[in-house]
């Protein structure tokens, strides 16, 4: 008799973390170049990525106790 294969859900927190780091770096560089609209957009991108990371970490915590 075949056994059902258990499928593990992988939650990636590292990608949003790296995306946030990149967005913050881009925001900083935009400020240095005087591109304030771009800086504000990149800052918002960083916030979105941090929120995704927070959700992934919360999910991991719930799964691991």
Which residues does each PLM region occupy?
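Short amphipathic alpha-helical heptad-repeat segments
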Residues: 12-23
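Short, charge-rich amphipathic interface segments used for partner binding and complex assembly
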Residues: 22-64
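Short, charge/polar-rich alpha-helical segments
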Residues: 2-14
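Short intrinsically disordered terminal tails
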Residues: 1-5, 60-65
């Amino acid at each position: 008799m075949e056994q059902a294969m258990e499928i593990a859900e992988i939650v990636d927190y590292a990608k949003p973390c790296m995306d946030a780091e990149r967005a913050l770096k881009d925001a900083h560089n935009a400020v240095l170049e005087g591109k304030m609209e771009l800086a504000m957009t990149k800052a918002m991108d960083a916030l979105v990525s941090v929120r995704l990371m927070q959700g992934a970490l919360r999910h991991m915590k719930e799964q691991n106790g």
